[in-house]
């Protein structure tokens, strides 16, 4: 076991940013000006999203967490600079504090037209901003095994990412309202357990055959085996406010995959739980963030969420040194101390009673730590 290598657990990070009008602080439909200018500098690492007020960026395949940090930092600086040159601001929050989706324009693209035509108001109202983390796998069989076990930990990491307490000018009472918005889509949420990659692929084939989807990219679960790459894609998290938070979360997902791989290599398996049970913890994470409690299914008892996150850190600790991600994983302690993005947004609002000030705070932290 001493020779076990984790070099195959590469990292890819996708972030979705909000485009902000510097005067009104509303979301700004910008006709893809940032995307067009960005593609001159970073090519296909910047993409349009369904709403014009959203810009999506994606890193290269990163060999370790330091490379991912540099790539995400460069992307944030580049997009921020382009936005500034166009008289626009950027920010990272799972929802905009007060802009209404009805005022935002849909990007003119055949894929988005198809989605809107099928999903109607569910698609038009899906004005949200997420973080996706890809972790490389040696093969798809290993990917489905790791995905099955990793489902249990999704609410733990999601709680750390919560960064969407407001929706259309209202305090929602949730630390992450983003997933409540996204739940209107089909094929979302915690995935089922699949016995094998063949079982998963048969499921996909059935959906394609019966005209539910045209390809597996329209399976929008919180965690999925990517349809085209040998990766496990973690999709549950709100976009974090800062790059350090994004990288800490990416490091957690990478280490979790490595730990589950290590157990598999020792002919050990982590207990798998039903979607129904995991959904209970997901709801708690959405509502309370890191300040609530979750269910420890093994002990059949409630446990403080922070305690469970510390237990997750202990669980992955033995693989962190070989991954070279100690500093990134350790930043989770800062996140637990300073509160999540949602906690900080709510604190600003409590102090100022101004959602405009909340937007300014979000924008002001876009390049923090870079």
Feature roles, as predicted:
Residues 109-130:
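Acidic, His- and aromatic-enriched active-site or binding-groove loops in soluble protein domains
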Residues 87-104, 168-172:
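Short, glycine/charge-rich beta-strand/loop segments that flank catalytic centers
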Residues 124-150:
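Internal, well-ordered domain-core segments that constitute the primary functional module
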Residues 1-86, 115, 182-370:
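C-terminal accessory/tail domains of diverse enzymes
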Residues 22, 88, 93-98, 131, ...:
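An acidic- and aromatic-residue-enriched active-site/binding cleft used to recognize and process polar
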Residues 101-113, 173-186, 281-282:
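Short, low-order "capping/linker" segments at domain edges
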Residues 139, 147-194:
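An exposed, glycine/acidic-rich loop-and-rim segment of catalytic or binding clefts
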Residues 85-93, 141-145, 158-162:
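Short secondary-structure capping/junction motifs at helix and strand boundaries
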